[in-house]
Amino acid sequence: MELLEKDAVIDGVRHRYAEAGAGPALVLVPGQSMPWQSYQRVLPRLAQRFHVYALDVRGHGKSEHTPGRYTFSRCGQDLVSFLTQVVGQPAICCGNSSGGLIAIWAAANAPERVRAVLAEDPPLFSAEWPRMRDDTWVHSFFVHVVKTLPDLAGFFSTLQVPSDGKVKLMPFPKPVAWVLGGAIRRRQKKHPGAPVDIRWLPLQVRLFVRGLSEYDVDFTRACTDGSMCDMDHADCVARVRCPMTLIQASSFRHESLGLVGAMDDADVARAKALKPDLVVEKWAKPHVVHLAAPKAYVAAVEALAVRARDFTHVPRPSAEPGRAGA
């Protein structure tokens, strides 16, 4: 597989993306803090059937940082403009987490550009304000991100996470934090300004560390104060006309912190009520499903592509939605 990294200026903002394969267009949008490389386990097989574009969202990876200008609608408009300027044909859009919300926004607001949507464990309804602040553990996690980054080693040494069935938060294991922190500092000293890529780490941890080392923390800051949350989730889901698959990963509720995960069953049921032809797949997998279950993920994309073949595009309505500023 020949994979090329390229840059494109989208609405005045430079975006990095990777491109491979030939066939119907397929765009991959990673979740918050993750670079396009998070799709490396599925890219080779997808590129056998599709012309694949894996995009670094603004503020992520090698894409330009735009502090003070992070909203779901801006990121959604970035994707629409990328589809128009770079892809040049209607595409299947697959997004993980916040990337799933971005793909849904694009499908709702530019129906002529999106053939189908695979929303991989997006925070549907839980990433609306004030629910994100009041009913999700991830808001506490985001506050920790803002307080500790760019001290990447310090981030892990003070990280605490909830565990299903336990009230008390579990600290990141100190011996692991010590070893990881030392490796991060050595890498930063040897390669100042470069992504922190520690190859002996498990792949998901390695990508998380790398992503955070390139990440504009202001993207997360916008999630702590609600300025990110300008998307009406119900309205967007209801306006998606193309085929859509929603993957729900594992989640649970903590008695004091609320939802731990992207969606609960009530959120999924609400999405299904808004879009009756929605295909829902519930997987007992962690949040980044394409890393945890790459073969099953590719199969889900291929099944969605079959449904997309039979979909007749509806042209954009005459009243276009307002464009988000760059």
Tell me what each language-model feature is:
Residues 1-26, 47-50, 83, 87-89, ...:
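Alpha/beta-hydrolase fold catalytic core
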Residues 13-65:
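Conserved HGGG/HGGXW glycine-rich cap/lid loop of the alpha/beta-hydrolase fold
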Residues 34-35, 60-63, 125, 254, ...:
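Active-site loop signature of alpha/beta-hydrolase-fold enzymes
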Residues 40, 54-94, 98, 136:
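Active-site loop/oxyanion-hole signature of alpha/beta-hydrolase fold enzymes
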Residues 51, 89-133:
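Conserved hydrolase catalytic core segment
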Residues 118-167:
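Flexible "cap/lid" loop of the alpha/beta hydrolase fold
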Residues 193-274:
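Conserved serine/cysteine hydrolase catalytic core
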Residues 285-294:
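Catalytic histidine-centered segment of alpha/beta-hydrolase-like enzymes
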